[in-house]
Amino acid sequence: MARRSCRTLGPTSLLVVRMDASQFLRILQPYYEAFAEHDAGHRLELLRVAMTPDAEIWGPVRVFSGYAQVSEKISGFHRNSPGCRLVLDTGLNIFLNSARIGSAIVGLDGAARARGEAIIELASDGRIQRVLPFWEEFPPLPASWPRELAGPPRQGTSEA
């Protein structure tokens, strides 16, 4: 059950709805099904269940906003990665109405071609309102960054 709470952010208050894992999973299923769907009409139906009308998927150079643009993004995924599927491959880290998730692009052979993370933000009605996917590894710290404020290199990076 969603629990409403008011969080004060500076001079304004923002109504934030707390969501639990079952609410995220219930809405992520049609979202991932939409990414697997080749039929544009059925894909739009799935997107309407999973996302708000003005929902956005952000990218490094473009924001896909609304059902038509998100569907266009999915069509591009099918063109650029034929036979591949976008799948959920981690549990959820939930902060009120946002969750950090892991996804993978899986080929016909079942092997992961790419892995990434995303921040999924749900609207008060429980549907997705924003997705911020990250497929790239973190870049190294700039050489100019103060040494006393820098941590050790992360595992799996080119610096480690």
Identify the function of each model-found stretch.
Residues 14, 37, 60, 118:
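Short, flexible active-site loop motifs that bind/organize anionic cofactors or intermediates
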Residues 2, 16-17:
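Acidic, Ala/Val/Gly-enriched low-complexity intrinsically disordered segments
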Residues 31, 35, 47, 51, ...:
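Conserved N-terminal glycine/acidic-rich loop preference
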Residues 41-98:
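A solvent-exposed, acidic/Ser-Thr-rich amphipathic alpha-helical stretch
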Residues 19-50:
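Short acidic-aromatic low-complexity motifs
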Residues 20, 77-160:
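A beta-strand edge to alpha-helix "cap/lid" segment located at domain peripheries
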